[in-house]
Amino acid sequence: VRLSEQLKPYKLKWIEDALISESIDQYEILRKRIPEQTLATGEQWYGVHPFFHAASRGIVDILQPDITWVGGLSAIIKIAHIAESAGIDVILHGGGGSVYGQHASYGLTGISMIECSGPVITPIGVPLEEKDRFPGTPIPKDGTIIPSDAPGFGLEIKKEWFPDFFS
């Protein structure tokens, strides 16, 4: 709360993950203490229920599910519908780093931005186009990313990667 007050002159767009993920009920207290500050969280929540809980109680402004941790594309669709019905925005945690997150962000209403980062093992300063990524995964250019329209979400999976499966 004190940090939020000290940062007011900088007009932060939002404060992200202000509390540990297990503290969902504490967000209700935080919301009452700093009602004017946009709050975002959810990247370490699992399944749909925490998002429903947060949206139905109006304790955050931006839900940030991680597509790999909440249960995949089906869960993201449910969360997007929950958020839309509550008037809450969704920004997928690391959504720009996977083709599934890219397609969900591009195709679902209520998702206004995409968070994009490269693999954590890639050295700082390496251009995005040179970072390790799954073949067929689009990369951002000039602040924009367009998901592939190729079959299979655009992933380029080669049979030689799975010799036992295709033998």
Name the predicted role of every residue range.
Residues R2:
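Short glycine/proline-centered loop/turn elements that form peptide/ligand docking sites
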Residues E5, K11, L19-T144, S148:
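Shared catalytic-loop signature of beta/alpha-barrel
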Residues K8, L39, L155-K159:
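Generic detection of intrinsically disordered/low-complexity segments and helix-coil linkers/edges
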Residues P151-S167:
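Extended hydrophobic packing segments that form well-structured cores
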